[in-house]
């Protein structure tokens, strides 16, 4: 299994699939799966390519989800090796996407291949959902596939998203949820004027100070057993013309909340509106909801994955909901039990992104054993 995973991972890394350009990665995967009897369905939306592949029929539907797109490489002269050369040095595979997430994608594919070869008449459905739009807009990828499946009443019961979840050593963390993410673009209106004549103007920066203080010090909740407290950060702020003698006519503030299951996006919007009204601000606000929080508590998938990882690594992982958003938030909308599990995330999006190939081999073992155990237990 190890050599097959390494070979496929290197083949995928050599394709410069900057989001949302798949660069033929999914075609490589589809051809492999089709030879084993997987049904291949292409679900393209705009410039994004999506693959929905499945083997078997009926329930339970156990899916692996991942993405072929990667982030830009930046200054290539800073890399030890060309970022799309897939160099293997001292058991470490280098390249953009090695950890996020072409390595675990290769492990998924090979694990599914091994399982289907050994169990051609298995019960239930083994599926793979692969997109080329995760790292950028994430508008035409997994979310559109999920919408398509839900519209035709096609379920996913369990799903492992192959994001690099491990922190210090392989298998130490299983992500069983994520916080929600909502961003506000706030425009506070004033009256532009000369700084020497403040009585003829209205400075929106001065007017907003009380509101901004309340906004940044407000305690939304105390978190819970699964999530830390909701947090708010101002990401961007802008006012003025650049001149030192002009009172600005508008203040722009962009802030983001990473919120837990103790609040909702509606509660957040309502509270912010109350604060703005309290401070008597003339404003316009635009909200963008990136994803609602989700949580997969104890269940067959979580229990099975924890047991399998412990058996393979000799260490029991712990559950965690930290970090940013992922495509798991879309799959959770189907009512599926969803977790994220993959290799170390220490080098993702960095120069010299890399992954230990022994970890990839273990990752493939985990995925295959989960299939065996889940389909036997259901």
UniProtKB/Swiss-Prot annotation:
UniProt KW tRNA processing keyword: no
Binding site for Zn(2+) 1: 67, 100, 163
Pathway(s) this gene product operates in, as recorded in its UniProt entry: Amino-acid biosynthesis; L-lysine biosynthesis via DAP pathway; LL-2,6-diaminopimelate from (S)-tetrahydrodipicolinate (succinylase route): step 3/3
EC numbers: 3.5.1.18
Key word Metal-binding present: yes
Catalytic residues in the record: 69, 134 (proton acceptor)
Segments crossing the lipid bilayer: none
GO MF terms held by the record: acetylornithine deacetylase activity; cobalt ion binding; succinyl-diaminopimelate desuccinylase activity; zinc ion binding
Keywords on record: Amino-acid biosynthesis, Cobalt, Diaminopimelate biosynthesis, Hydrolase, Lysine biosynthesis, Metal-binding, Zinc
Enzyme class: hydrolase
Pfam annotation, one family: Peptidase_M20
Cofactor: record remark: Binds 2 Zn(2+) or Co(2+) ions per subunit.
SUPFAM superfamilies found in the cross-reference section: Bacterial exopeptidase dimerisation domain, Zn-dependent exopeptidases
Cofactor names: Zn(2+); Co(2+)
GO terms for biological process, alphabetical: diaminopimelate biosynthetic process; L-arginine biosynthetic process; lysine biosynthetic process via diaminopimelate
Binding-site residues for Zn(2+) 2, renumbered to this chain: 100, 135, 349
InterPro entries, A to Z: ArgE/DapE_CS, Bact_exopeptidase_dim_dom, DapE_proteobac, Peptidase_M20, Peptidase_M20_dimer, Peptidase_M20A
Stored PROSITE patterns: ARGE_DAPE_CPG2_1
Catalytic activity: N-succinyl-(2S,6S)-2,6-diaminopimelate + H2O = (2S,6S)-2,6-diaminopimelate + succinate
NCBIfam families linked to this entry: dapE_proteo (TIGR01246), PRK13009.1 (NF009557)
Subunit and interaction comment: Homodimer.
Family, as annotated: Belongs to the peptidase M20A family. DapE subfamily.
Protein name, entry field: Succinyl-diaminopimelate desuccinylase
């Amino acid at each position: 299994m190890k050599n097959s995973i390494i070979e496929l991972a290197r083949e995928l890394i050599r394709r410069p699939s900057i989001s949302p350009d798949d660069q033929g990665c999914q075609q490589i995967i589809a051809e492999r799966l089709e030879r084993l009897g997987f049904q291949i369905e292409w679900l393209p939306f705009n410039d994004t390519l999506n693959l929905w592949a499945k083997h078997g029929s009926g329930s339970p539907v156990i899916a692996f989800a991942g993405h072929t797109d990667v982030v830009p490489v930046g200054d290539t002269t800073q890399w030890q090796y060309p970022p799309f050369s897939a160099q293997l040095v001292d058991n470490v595979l280098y390249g953009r996407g090695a950890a996020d997430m072409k390595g675990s994608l290769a492990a998924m594919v090979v694990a599914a291949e091994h399982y289907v070869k050994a169990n051609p008449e298995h019960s239930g459905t083994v599926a793979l959902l692969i997109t080329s739009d995760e790292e950028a807009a994430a508008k035409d990828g997994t979310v559109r596939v999920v919408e398509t499946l839900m519209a035709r009443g096609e379920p996913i019961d369990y799903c492992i998203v192959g994001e690099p979840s491990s922190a210090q050593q392989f298998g130490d963390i299983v992500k069983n949820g994520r916080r929600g993410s909502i961003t506000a673009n706030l425009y506070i209106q004033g009256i532009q004027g000369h700084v020497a004549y403040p009585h003829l103007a209205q400075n929106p920066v001065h007017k907003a100070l009380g509101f901004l203080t309340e906004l940044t010090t407000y305690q939304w909740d105390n978190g819970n057993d699964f999530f830390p407290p909701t947090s708010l950060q101002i990401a961007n702020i802008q006012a003025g013309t650049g001149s030192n003698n002009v009172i600005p006519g508008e203040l722009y503030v962009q802030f983001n909340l990473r919120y837990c299951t103790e609040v909702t996006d509606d509660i957040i919007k309502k509270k912010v509106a109350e604060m703005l009204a309290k401070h008597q601000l003339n404003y316009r606000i635009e909200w963008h909801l990136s994803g609602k929080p989700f949580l997969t508590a104890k269940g067959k998938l979580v229990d099975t994955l924890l047991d399998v990882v412990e058996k393979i690594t000799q260490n029991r992982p712990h559950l965690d909901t930290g970090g940013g958003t992922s495509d798991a938030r879309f799959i959770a909308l189907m009512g599926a039990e969803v977790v994220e599990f993959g290799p170390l995330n220490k080098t993702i999006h960095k120069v010299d992104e890399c992954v230990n190939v022994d970890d990839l081999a273990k990752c493939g073992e985990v995925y295959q054993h989960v299939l065996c155990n889940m389909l036997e237990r259901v």
